[in-house]
Amino acid sequence: MMKNSCRLLLILIGLWMANVSLAQKTFRNPIITGMNPDPSICRVGDDFYLVTSTFEYFPGLPVYHSKDLVHWKLIGHALSRPENNPLMGCNASTGGQYAPTLRYHDGTFYVIGTNYGGKGSQGVFYVTAKNPAGPWSDPVWVGNWYVDPSIEFIDGKMYFLSPDNQGSFLLGVMDPETGTFVEALRKVASGLGGSSPEGPHFYKIGDYYYIMSAEGGTGYEHREVIQRSKSPWGPYEPSPVNPVLSNMNCPDHPFQAIGHADLVQLKDGSWWAVCLGIRPVNGKYQHLGRETFLAPVTWDADGWPKVGKDGVVQETYLFPNLPSHVWMEQPVRDDFDQETLGLDWTFIRNPAHSFWSLTEKPGSLRLKGTAINFTTNDSPSFIGRRQAAFNLTASAKVNFIPKVENEEAGLVVRADDKNHYDLLITERNGQRVAMIRKTLKDKVVDTTCKELPATGEVILSITATETTYTFEIKAAHVSAILGTASTRDVSNEVVGGFTGVFIGMYASGNGQANTNPADFDWFDFRCLD
């Protein structure tokens, strides 16, 4: 009897462990949260690498690494030096670095993209590296073609594919050393009926050459279509099951604007797609920006692919046939006790090294307010991070003593130059105060002040939910919630553009340099989703 009971217990434990194992073999979308649009992916052996767009933010084009397609680690940026990433003058949320493509060939990584609107930019470029973490080469400028170029190495040739802004796709063969064309660009295909054909990728799979591209604009009608030919130069026939990827006919789905995909094949022969998408709050407004999603790809008997379930990206899928590899979590708090900033920190356009320092006051990030503020397409004294979760807290301890009323420093929730919420320390009528200032559509619509002690450190905190930001201060003998603000008013549907919200630290003299620096002792960033 005892033996039978033990045997039954072991069976039950085994079944429980099997169920746990099965439960663990799923993943949830999105796989990279916060503003990470236009993902492009490649596999090198057992490793996967992925790059996304950054627009006016610097450093440009983050490079992520994964072992299992689900868990990703930021390892570097393809454009990490101001001289190879000219962003000054580019428009907020619509200029800068567009839609890169990442490929690997014969020991070298290639990233091709477009710098749109930056002073000194020459349009389309590519950079190379032996190690995807860097260093990356200086740009090889290709020319002022349209945005969203792609490359693919097939049968020893480097094919270059790009939209032409007239609804067609141009294909040529490029010298990888010089960026010159050894086979001239020619029109090989057109879009398949949707607006704004863009983001094409070129593949040879089996006997066919495929052009997979996005259509429908960047909004809720975004979708992915595919066409193929036996020759790279055409003629191309469209898939009978287009679009191969879109959530546009599922208005109640939590994911929308799905598209701009890239394909990758695993060692086991299975195919997967990474793509961009948004998560609108209550189905209406999204402020995190376009994020990166993952879905399986199936091929029918005629050689046509379909992404997800009937072309729809779902919240949960079975895990890829790969061992799970979870990276060590990044610390919630940055104490600024290292010699360099972490890879997650981001600037607006090309920063001046003179406005920030980790060495002038060791153990602190020192920001020096310049004459530049958030209203121009210049580079203000700002260092921030993507808002990577709906629910989070961002807080910092800062010591800042303004001398005149134009001087300020604090935290900011930034959608773009004309739409941001500032939680700041400044001076009013000879008194140091904390203030929340809401700027929407380039107009200050609301301010609230609270007096502070004349000296001493202040803790500034922002708490985010799906619909609201709450702004709080703490100092000696002072603790107050200064107010709240709506996430809707900084959403893409309201302010436009292609980016998402960033939260960070800043300082400004609003027309002249600050007398005193702002010393940030630490910054906490706690994602709670």
Swiss-Prot record:
Signal found in the keyword field: yes
Places the protein is found: Periplasm
Catalytic reactions of this protein: Hydrolysis of terminal non-reducing alpha-L-arabinofuranoside residues in alpha-L-arabinosides
EC number per UniProt: 3.2.1.55
GO cellular component: periplasmic space
pH dependence, entry free text: Optimum pH is 6.0-7.0.
Catalytic residues identified in the record: D38, E198
Pfam families assigned: GH43_C2, Glyco_hydro_43
Keyword Secreted (UniProt): no
UniProt-listed InterPro entries: ConA-like_dom_sf (IPR013320), GH43_C2 (IPR041542), Glyco_hydro_43 (IPR006710), Glyco_hydro_beta-prop_sf (IPR023296), Glycosyl_Hydrlase_43 (IPR051795)
GO biological process terms held by the UniProt record: symbiotic process benefiting host; xyloglucan catabolic process
Pathway the protein acts in: Glucan metabolism; xyloglucan degradation
A GO molecular function held by the record: alpha-L-arabinofuranosidase activity
Coiled coil: none
Domain of life: Bacteria
Principal location listed in the UniProt entry: periplasm
Signal peptide positions on this chain: 1-23
Other comments on record: Gut bacteria supply the human body with energy from dietary polysaccharides through glycosidases that are absent in the human genome. Xyloglucans are a ubiquitous family of highly branched plant cell wall polysaccharides present in the vegetables we consume. Enzymes involved in xyloglucan degradation mediate the conversion of otherwise indigestible plant polysaccharides to short-chain fatty acids.
Functional summary from the UniProt entry: Alpha-L-arabinofuranosidase involved in xyloglucan degradation by mediating the cleavage of terminal non-reducing alpha-L-arabinofuranoside residues in xyloglucan branches, converting the 'S' units to 'X' units.
UniProt family annotation: Belongs to the glycosyl hydrolase 43 family.
Listed PANTHER family: BETA-XYLOSIDASE, BETA-XYLOSIDASE-RELATED
Name of the protein in its database record: Non-reducing end alpha-L-arabinofuranosidase BoGH43B
